[in-house]
Swiss-Prot record:
The encoding gene: MEF2
Function as written in the Swiss-Prot or TrEMBL entry: Mitochondrial GTPase that mediates the disassembly of ribosomes from messenger RNA at the termination of mitochondrial protein biosynthesis. Not involved in the GTP-dependent ribosomal translocation step during translation elongation.
Protein name: Ribosome-releasing factor 2, mitochondrial
Organism: Eremothecium gossypii (strain ATCC 10895 / CBS 109.51 / FGSC 9923 / NRRL Y-1056) (Yeast)
Single GO BP term: mitochondrial translation
Domain of life of the organism encoding this protein: Eukaryota
The keyword S-adenosyl-L-methionine is assigned to this record: no
A GO term from the CC aspect: mitochondrion
C-alpha cells in the first residue's frame, strides 16, 4: 500500500493502531529551496523542465462513467483529495466540488458538462481524469469524452445495482478497458454480491474481485456497518476511521483471523478466473506456488490482472463508500496498476487506413514511421470569460508546441497556435508543450474560428512550420469524427426586439460551438429560429445559459417534441443546366440500409437526421484528378450545405424537417474556371426543392420519436403504472421483471446463457445483514417495466409517476428511433404543433 506508511500487524493483534496516510509524493519543482547558486538555479530549471516530460508508460487517461447519482463526482473529489491535489473535500450537496463548477451544476447538484483535471498518484503516475455527466440528456458529453480516454472507472450504486444508463454508457465504452467500483456500500440495502451478479449478467463480463466488503459493529448495540474491505490481492484487512479521512488501519490476515477462509476463497476465485486465459500464471501456480493459491505473490497476481484487464477478458471489481471516504485509495491503485497507458491503448480510427500506425514508447503513436508527426483530436470547445475560446484536445502522437503552425486536416486550414494550457477543472496552467497522451487546451483569440469539435490537428514536433515537409497523405490524416446523437426536443428562440437578432445569433453560435448536440434551425421563409436538443433538461439548461451566462436578449418558447417527415417514394430525376457551364442531375428518395453498401464511395452524412448525400463519380474528374480552382472538398461541402438547407424546409404534411432521405446526385459538370461555390449553391438547392415540391402531399409521412423506457415501481403500484402506460401513453410493454433479480432476466441467446452460468459459479461473499433486513422489511423487491413509448406521451411523466406511486417510482428513458405515426395519432401531433 504505497499510499500509507504501512507496518502491518496480524488480524488478531491488539491494540488497534491507525496509520495516517501520505497523500502524494512531493515533486521536485514543489520543493522549498533556500539560497542557491546560479549554477544550482540552472540545474533546478532544467530539472523542473525535465520533470514535466512524463514517462508515457506512467500516464493514465481515464473517465468516470455511471448512472446519475451513483457517486461519480463524489468519488472524483476524494481522488483529488487523497492525491494531494486539493486540501479540502467538497460536497455535491453544498455545491463546492472542484469538477462541478458551472452555476447550473452547483445549484442543481448534477454534472452537466465533462470536466478534466490532472493529478499525480503513487510512484509519479500522472492521471488525467474526466468526470462525465450521468443524466441521459447529456449523453453527448459522455460520447465525446470516451473518444479520448484510454480507460474507464465504472461506478455502480450498491443499492440500485446496474441501472439503465449504466448499461448504455457501458456499451458506448465497449472498446475501453475498465475497472468497476461498487459505491455506497454504507447505505441500508447495499448488496455487493447482488450488484456483482448484475454486473456479470447485464453487462456480459467476467469479474475479478480484488476486494470484498467488511462490516463490523461500532458498539455492542448497533447493527454492523460498512467499515472497510478485505483485500484479496494483498491479503489484508483495510479499515477506515469514520472520524478522520486521513486515518486507515491495515492488518495482515493470517490463519488465526476470522476472515482467513473468506480470503482463501476470494484468492482461489481470482486465480482460477485468471488461469482460464493466462498461461504464465498457470505455470507459476503449478510450479513455484505448488498449487497453493495463497503462495502466488502480489507482483505475479498484479501482472496477470493487468493482462486480463487490457485484453478486456475481465473487469477488476472493488468496493467502497466514497462519501464516507472508504475504498478510494485502492481504487486509485487499480487505475495505475491495471488500466492502459497511451502506449497500450486502442489505436484511434484514422481515415487513411493505408498508412501504418503503431504504438511507440516515446511518440505515443508512430504514424507512417514519421517521428516528427504530431496528431491530435479536438473533442470539446468551451468559452472562458477571461481567456475566451478554449479547445480541448488529446495528443495521440508526437509533441504539440505553442507558437507552431499547425494544419486542421478536417477543414484544410493552416493556423498558428497561441497558448497551450493544462486545465485543472476551472483552473488553468500555461504550458509550452503537450506530449503524447496529454489532454490539454488550445487558447487564443481566433482558435474557435479554426477548430471545432471533432477536428483533427496535424503538426510538426520540432519545426515551427514543419508541416510543409509532410506528405499529402499525412496532411490528409483524420481521426474519425465524433458522432452526434439526434435531438428529440425543440424550443423556439426569438430576439426580444428586431435589433437584438444579431446578438441572439452570436449567442446561439457560441452555445452550439460548445455543445454540438444542440442543433439550431433557421427557417428563412418565416424567420423562426428553433433550438433542438437531447431532452427537456438539456434545453432547459441551454436556455438558462443563454439568458444568465451569455446575457442574450432572447425569449425561449415552450419545450416541445421534435417531429420529422419522410418521403414514401422517390422523386422524379431533376436536371438543371446554366449558361455558364454548371450542370446537375439528381433525385431524392427514402433511405434504406442497403444504400451504404451500394454507394461505398461518395457517401456523405447530412447532419443528425439520418439523411445522406450520394455523389456519383464524374467519368472525367475525381478527387485525385481535379483541374478546377475550387478544391474538391469545397465542392462537396457546398452540395452538403445545399442538401441540409433544402431538407430543413420540411415536408408537405406539416413542414417538419425531413428525415431518412437520400439525395442522389447522378451527374454533374463544372466549368474549368470554377473557383467559388456560389454558383453551385444557386443551382443545387433550388433543384432539390423542385424535386421535393413535385411530390404530392400523400407521399410524405410524419415520424415521431420512440423511446426505450424503464419504469421501476413497487409491486403494489405495478397495476396502475402498467395501465397508465398501455392506456394513456400508448406504450408497447416489452417485459416486467423483478428488480435486481438477475437470475430471472430473459435468456434469449448463447451469450446470456454463458454469463448466467458464470454468475452462478462466481464466488461471492454473503450480502450483509443490513441488505437482508431491508428485503425482509419490504417483503418484496421492486418491479421493472420495460416498454417502447412515443416521446409525446412521456412529456412530464415524472409528475404522473409520483402521483401513481406516492413518490416511490422512478424511470429512465433513452432514444430508440423515429417511427411513422399512425393515422389516429397524426391529428394530435398536428394539434400540438399548432397546425
Amino acid at each position: 500500500m504505497p499510499w500509507c506508511n504501512t507496518r502491518l500487524r496480524t488480524c488478531g493483534a491488539s491494540p488497534k493502531i491507525f496509520l495516517r496516510r501520505v497523500r502524494c509524493p512531493v515533486l521536485l519543482h514543489n520543493w522549498t529551496i533556500g539560497r542557491v547558486s546560479s549554477v544550482s538555479k540552472m540545474i533546478l530549471r532544467f530539472l523542473r523542465s525535465y520533470s514535466k516530460r512524463v514517462d508515457i508508460t506512467r500516464v493514465r487517461n481515464i473517465g468516470i462513467i455511471a448512472h446519475i447519482d451513483a457517486g461519480k463526482t463524489t468519488t472524483t473529489e476524494r481522488m483529488l483529495y487523497y492525491s494531494g491535489k486539493i486540501k479540502r473535500i467538497g460536497d455535491v450537496d453544498h455545491g463546492d466540488t472542484i469538477t462541478d463548477f458551472l452555476p447550473q451544476e452547483r445549484s442543481r447538484g448534477i454534472t452537466i458538462q465533462s470536466a478534466a483535471i490532472s493529478f499525480n498518484w503513487r510512484d509519479n503516475y500522472t492521471v488525467n481524469l474526466i468526470d462525465t455527466p450521468g443524466h441521459a440528456d447529456f449523453t453527448f458529453e459522455v460520447i465525446r469524452s470516451l473518444r479520448v480516454l484510454d480507460g474507464c472507472v465504472t461506478i455502480l450504486d450498491a443499492v440500485a445495482g446496474v441501472e439503465a444508463q449504466t448499461e448504455k454508457v457501458w456499451k458506448q465504452a465497449a472498446e475501453i478497458p475498465k475497472v468497476c467500483f461498487i459505491n455506497k456500500m454504507d447505505r441500508v440495502g447495499a448488496g455487493y454480491s447482488r450488484a456483482v451478479k448484475e454486473l456479470i449478467v447485464k453487462l456480459k463480463t467476467r469479474v475479478l474481485l480484488l476486494n470484498t466488503p467488511l462490516f463490523a459493529a461500532r458498539d455492542s448495540s448497533a447493527d454492523p456497518v460498512f467499515v472497510g474491505v478485505l483485500d484479496a490481492v494483498n491479503g489484508q484487512l483495510l479499515e477506515w476511521d469514520p472520524e478522520d479521512p486521513d486515518k486507515i488501519s491495515a492488518k495482515a490476515v493470517d490463519k488465526e483471523c476470522a476472515h482467513y477462509e473468506e480470503l482463501v476463497s476470494a484468492r482461489e476465485a481470482l486465480v482460477e478466473t485468471l488461469s482460464e486465459v493466462d498461461e504464465k500464471l498457470v505455470e507459476y501456480f503449478l510450479g513455484e506456488a505448488d498449487g497453493d493459491y495463497m503462495k502466488v505473490p502480489v507482483e505475479v497476481l498484479n501482472e496477470s490482472i493487468r493482462r486480463a484487464t487490457l485484453s478486456q477478458y475481465a473487469v477488476p471489481v472493488l468496493c467502497g463508500a466514497s462519501f464516507k471516504n472508504i475504498g478510494v485509495q485502492p481504487l486509485l491503485d487499480a487505475v495505475v496498476d491495471y488500466l492502459p497507458s497511451p502506449a497500450e491503448a486502442r489505436l484511434p480510427e484514422l481515415s487513411n487506413k493505408d498508412l501504418p500506425v503503431q504504438h511507440h514508447l516515446k511518440n505515443g503513436l508512430l504514424v507512417n514511421k514519421n517521428a516528427n508527426l504530431c496528431l491530435a483530436l479536438a473533442f470539446k470547445v468551451t468559452t472562458d470569460p477571461i481567456r475566451g475560446a478554449m479547445v480541448f484536445i488529446r495528443v495521440y502522437s508526437g509533441v504539440l508546441n505553442s507558437g507552431h503552425t499547425v494544419y486542421n486536416s478536417s477543414t484544410g486550414v493552416k493556423f498558428k497556435l497561441g497558448k497551450l494550457i493544462k486545465m485543472h477543472a476551472n483552473v488553468a496552467e500555461d504550458i509550452k508543450s503537450l506530449h503524447p497522451g496529454d489532454i490539454g487546451v488550445l487558447a487564443g483569440a481566433n482558435v474557435a474560428d479554426h477548430v471545432r469539435t471533432g477536428d483533427t490537428i496535424v503538426a510538426h514536433c520540432t519545426s515551427k512550420d514543419g508541416i510543409r515537409s509532410f506528405k499529402k497523405a499525412e496532411l490528409a490524416l483524420r481521426i474519425h469524427p465524433i458522432d452526434i446523437p439526434p435531438p428529440v426536443f425543440s424550443a423556439a428562440v426569438e430576439p426580444r426586439t428586431l435589433g437584438n437578432k444579431k446578438a441572439m445569433d452570436e449567442s446561439l453560435t457560441q452555445l452550439t460551438r460548445e455543445d454540438p448536440s444542440l442543433v439550431i434551425v433557421r427557417d428563412e421563409e418565416t424567420g423562426q429560429t428553433v433550438m433542438n436538443g437531447m431532452g427537456e433538461l438539456h434545453l432547459e439548461i441551454a436556455a438558462d445559459r443563454l439568458l444568465n451566462e451569455f446575457k442574450a436578449p432572447v425569449r425561449v418558447g415552450k419545450v416541445a417534441v421534435s417531429y420529422k417527415e419522410t418521403i414514401n417514394t422517390a422523386t422524379e430525376t431533376k436536371h438543371s443546366e446554366t449558361d455558364d457551364g454548371y450542370s446537375f442531375e439528381l433525385e431524392v428518395r427514402q433511405y434504406n440500409e442497403e444504400d451504404k453498401v451500394l454507394f461505398s464511395n461518395g457517401w456523405y452524412p447530412l447532419g443528425s437526421d439520418n439523411n445522406y448525400l450520394v455523389i456519383d463519380p464524374n467519368p472525367r474528374f475525381n478527387e485525385d484528378n481535379w483541374p478546377f480552382p475550387l478544391k474538391y472538398e469545397a465542392f462537396v461541402n457546398s452540395i452538403i450545405s445545399c442538401c441540409i438547407v433544402a431538407l430543413q424546409r420540411g415536408g408537405k404534411t406539416a413542414g417538419f424537417p425531413l428525415h431518412s432521405c437520400v439525395i442522389h446526385v447522378k451527374r454533374w459538370r463544372l466549368p474549368l474556371d470554377c473557383a467559388a461555390a456560389a454558383s453551385i449553391l444557386l443551382t443545387v438547392r433550388p433543384l432539390i426543392i423542385s424535386a421535393l415540391t413535385s411530390l404530392p402531399t400523400s407521399a410524405f409521412s410524419i415520424l415521431e420519436p420512440i423511446m426505450n423506457v424503464e419504469v421501476t415501481v413497487q409491486q403494489q403500484d405495478l397495476g396502475s403504472v402498467v395501465q397508465d402506460l398501455t392506456g394513456a401513453r400508448k406504450a408497447n410493454i416489452l417485459s416486467i421483471d423483478d428488480e435486481h433479480h438477475w437470475a430471472d432476466a430473459a435468456v434469449t441467446d448463447k451469450d446470456v446463457h454463458l454469463f448466467h452460468d458464470i454468475a452462478e459459479k462466481q464466488y461471492l461473499p454473503p450480502d450483509s445483514t443490513v441488505f437482508q433486513a431491508k428485503l425482509n422489511k419490504e417483503g418484496q423487491t421492486g418491479k421493472i417495466v420495460k416498454a417502447h413509448v412515443p416521446l409525446k406521451e412521456m412529456v412530464s411523466y415524472m409528475n404522473k409517476l409520483r402521483m401513481l406511486t406516492k413518490g416511490r417510482g422512478s424511470f429512465h428513458m433513452s432514444y430508440l428511433g423515429m417511427e411513422r405515426a399512425s393515422s389516429d395519432r397524426v391529428d394530435g401531433i398536428l394539434e400540438d404543433a399548432d397546425l
